[in-house]
Amino acid sequence: MFLSDFDYELPPELIAQHPASRRDASRLLTLDRLSGAIGEATVASIAAQFLPGDLLVLNDTRVIPARLHGHKESGGAVEIFLVRRVAGEPECWSCLIKASKSPKNGCRVVFPGGVTATVLERDGGDWRVLFEGSDDFMAWLEQTGSMPLPPYIKRAPEGEDLERYQTVFAREKGAVAAPTAGLHFTPAILDEIRGRGVEIVSVTLHVGLGTFMPIRVEDLSEHTMHRELYRIPQETAAAIRRTKERGGRVVALGTTSLRALEHAAASGEVAAGEREADIFILPGYRFRVVDALITNFHLPKSTLFMLVCAFAGKEAMLEAYREAVSRRFRFFSYGDAMFIG
């Protein structure tokens, strides 16, 4: 398969630069995987898409203010962008570093509050960095860092982003990008879904900067997928087993939830625990866990667009995207949503 197979035309004015007036005010495009039928609804009415006995799986990651500004001990300015936490080491991160000169192993960066960062080594295309000097690193980060926004949002972060670029169920700090399908959901919508006889559980996948990185090869067999840290609780794995046994659907809220579940089921059944997902889902992939997907619209030629093409069929998905463009749906992180069932 080739990168050019997953391209589509998108007028730039359809890329949402701000969130909708309310979380549940977005539009919803529906796609039936079996018939290819396309419909339209609203996020406010999304509970109607669920059936009694379904299981909804959320990603409860919380976006952190991942952009930090400090200086070398010699005085030069340094910007560090946290990409992902190193598994098992809460204050060691893979980072992007912007400075006048490329950093060297052992270089120390000083930040407000007495925190220092030591550059340890290269970690693929990133740097592995150890932060020291804070009793509560995440609390310090909340005070010191700035909120990241996706590169296709062509404006500076504003006050509304602190609330709206975060899901209402965000809990586990560690993402540098939001699981955007969840941005539409309100407590009232979740209550309405529960009222239809649907169980709701969570996973944690800390969305990394790699979600925005373009694929740089035409032959997709040559692409190396980025890694993201995730955790499946025991109760979530058990709920999935119960749902499958009774014939219910597992509905993933967002591609991040889907990637965590499918990676955790590599041996057949979803296994609880903490791992790193590097799963690259292309058409032809056999889905083991997820039966329905709620997702936003994804960038052309992106790994996430390839994922939804694998889930619904490439031609059906391309047709759905053409329909979304013709109906002037809003695209990407602050855009509208899809329910693929």
From Swiss-Prot:
EC assignment: 2.4.99.17
GO MF term (any one): S-adenosylmethionine:tRNA ribosyltransferase-isomerase activity
A GO cellular-component term linked to this record: cytoplasm
Subcellular locations according to the entry: Cytoplasm
Pathway: tRNA modification; tRNA-queuosine biosynthesis
Gene3D superfamilies linked to this entry: QueA-like
InterPro entries, sorted: QueA (IPR003699), QueA_dom1 (IPR042118), QueA_dom2 (IPR042119), QueA_sf (IPR036100)
Catalytic activity from the UniProt record: 7-aminomethyl-7-carbaguanosine(34) in tRNA + S-adenosyl-L-methionine = epoxyqueuosine(34) in tRNA + adenine + L-methionine + 2 H(+)
Pfam families linked to this entry: Queuosine_synth
UniProt keywords, alphabetically: Cytoplasm, Queuosine biosynthesis, S-adenosyl-L-methionine, Transferase
GO biological process: queuosine biosynthetic process; tRNA wobble guanine modification
Assembly and interaction partners: Monomer.
Family (UniProt): Belongs to the QueA family.
Function of the molecule: Transfers and isomerizes the ribose moiety from AdoMet to the 7-aminomethyl group of 7-deazaguanine (preQ1-tRNA) to give epoxyqueuosine (oQ-tRNA).
Protein name: S-adenosylmethionine:tRNA ribosyltransferase-isomerase
